[in-house]
C-alpha cells in the first residue's frame, strides 16, 4: 500500500515554490507564442482562409458553419481550432495568475510581487486589448497567412 504524500527533502522554500507556480502561466504564454507560427503554417498550407464559407464575427471568433448540405467544411473547423488555441492559452494564463487561493498567482505574488505584476500584465494587456477590439486571433492568423502565403 502506498503511503501517500511523503516529504523527502524538507519544506519547499518560497522561491522554489514561486518558480514552480510561475511555470504554469509561462507555459500558457509559450503555447500561445508557439501556436502563432504553427497555426499560420497549418492554415497557410491547407488554404483554409481561401475558403469563402467562414464569415467573420467582429470579436474575432468565426461564426462558423461546419455543415453545408451534405459536406463537412473542415476549413472552418481548422480556423476555429487555431482561434480557440490562442484564446484558451491567453485566458487560462490570465486566470491562473489571479492572486487567490490555490491559483498560481497567489504563490507567485507571495514569492515576488514584481514577477507577479510582470506576468499578470503580460496576460492582461493582450486580453483587454482583444476584448476592446484592437486585435483578434482571427485577424492575426489571417493577416499572417496572407502575408506569408
What are these regions (language model features)?
Residues 1-149:
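Hydrophobic transmembrane alpha-helices and their immediate loop junctions
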Amino acid at each position: 500500500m502506498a503511503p501517500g504524500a511523503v516529504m523527502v527533502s524538507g519544506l519547499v522554500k518560497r522561491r522554489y515554490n514561486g518558480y514552480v507556480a510561475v511555470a504554469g502561466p509561462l507555459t500558457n504564454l509559450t503555447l500561445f507564442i508557439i501556436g502563432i507560427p504553427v497555426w499560420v503554417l497549418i492554415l497557410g498550407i491547407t488554404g483554409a482562409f481561401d475558403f469563402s464559407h467562414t464569415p467573420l464575427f467582429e470579436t474575432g471568433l468565426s461564426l462558423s458553419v461546419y455543415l453545408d448540405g451534405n459536406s463537412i467544411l473542415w476549413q472552418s473547423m481548422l480556423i476555429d481550432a487555431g482561434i480557440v488555441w490562442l484564446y484558451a492559452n491567453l485566458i487560462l494564463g490570465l486566470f491562473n495568475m489571479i492572486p487567490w487561493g490555490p491559483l498560481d498567482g497567489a504563490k507567485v505574488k507571495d514569492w515576488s510581487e514584481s514577477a507577479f505584476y510582470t506576468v499578470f500584465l503580460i496576460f492582461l494587456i493582450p486580453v483587454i486589448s482583444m476584448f476592446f477590439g484592437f486585435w483578434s486571433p482571427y485577424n492575426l492568423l489571417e493577416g499572417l497567412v496572407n502575408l506569408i502565403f
